[in-house]
Amino acid sequence: MRVTGGIARGIQLRVPTQGGVRPATDYIREAVFNSLAAFVPGTAVLDLFAGTGAYGLESLSRGALRATCVDERIGTDLTANAAAVAKSMGLAELPFTKITGDATKPGVAEGRFDLVFADPPWELWQTKGAEIAA
């Protein structure tokens, strides 16, 4: 798995080997970001069900001003991915916030966001789909 565009293009992202994490493929994220290319620069991004942080980090690579990643389990992979992207962008630190919390709950992340990515695990989508969509 890698960053598909922007300054950090090609940077490998770590993915947990346990816990059933199956992040969106590079191909899917690239298609999403190609569709949104004109809208990403200068935005504040919220990445719900962040897992590896791929959507938030990809957004920063493509010019977003800040990204907030929310997941019930913020692990070392997300932290390592943020550090790798920051290094590739020549930054000591990214404008990046990690929140450990339930992404289905309103108000889990404070502030105003221009783009929101919500890519929940399939099982969660089946049990809480209506709640997530609200």
Annotate each language-model stretch with its function.
Residues 1-134:
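Class I S-adenosyl-L-methionine-dependent methyltransferase catalytic core
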